[in-house]
């Protein structure tokens, strides 16, 4: 009686590329390109790009010396959080009082009905704590976070592409965009939202490689038909923290959280399929989807609720305001919160009571966003369908009719000078990005290149939901959350144009020429629009040369 030799696990290539080369097995593909290029060079270059971005953002940061656009809400809310632990209503003429140097005695007794979460305002408060309640103080946090976002962009693109050079190009492109520059120089919330979203997506992309590596190490011939179990995924927990902070800045982060959560499941299923697991999509929904939900969504929920700590600690003030102040009931149909008339609880009951009050508060704020702005108008409102084409910028600040001989104006007789801060993206970057996104859709759908899918899903989840709300005043600078993924699409397209081979060839020469020319055009465009992004004095003729379309006025 003979005994058959034990079967050895055999690795079989899954398919062939369009060039006829065999696709490497899962074990080799899981290794990625972690050691492909020198990390010291990568980090040194990224830090250098970040320092350049910081210089551009902190230069004359305190001008204009006034509350610009919605800074009047967020900067003052942040100051109240810092001094009171929650947002209190301000006295009349508070803006003028603050700009005159008086920063105390500004508040009324009752809390204020704020309509955005508090994470971004706490970050603004850190700048005010460090540098004072003045324009530099309430803008410096945005400058720091905007610069850190450039660093994150360098590392994100490098992680996706495996190229240090493309990573640095991605960081520079982000740095040279007008929306990013201006929002990094204002005390608004959107730059913080974009930063945390990019951080969350970066962690999810890192989890993809980490999960495949762990799956490869643990999968063997003796594994069950489900494949190895990988329950602890630290990068997903980090992503959950980042998304929690993003939602704690603005609720719109819920859409990319949902979209990339689905992508996590599909990527996990694809990893299992590459190891021969049958019905991988269905099995992964249970084996990977459930743990990922806890790591990503529930962690985000915990972080989000914790970000309301100041509000929860002063829930009693809000509860009492529903009894005496109509601003807390107008959006909820005039109904008082049930917690307002309940006896004050203690211990765990007090926590529960405060959370219930927070839930009622969220209901009223949601009603405000969903219904009470529908009939409003704003001179700078724009349709989201045209955001990626830079259809309608936002005038943040303007000093018009500066006469010759004043403030350094050297306009010819009969003309004048002006200063302006315009929330407008770099047109060359965004228009080129639209073409790159079309290419990304083709590469994701046709070549099934997951990297292009990150760009497509990122733009879709941060842009398309706004089409549901185009009957209310919304603004082009909300597209700042799309920008990192537009830049990713551009850098991936550049990589395809240049090719992976370093050997000289006509194709590589043409690709480098096209990609390099585009980068130079973006840089030249950045220099050209710099004055209308940074409040620089211009003659009227110089200003007109930069306003390419009537709808930009």
Language-model region placement:
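Membrane-interface transmembrane helices that cradle and orient dolichyl/undecaprenyl
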Residues: 12, 160-161, 200-235, 264-272
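Start-transfer (signal-anchor) and selected internal transmembrane alpha helices
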Residues: 1-56, 287-300, 505-515
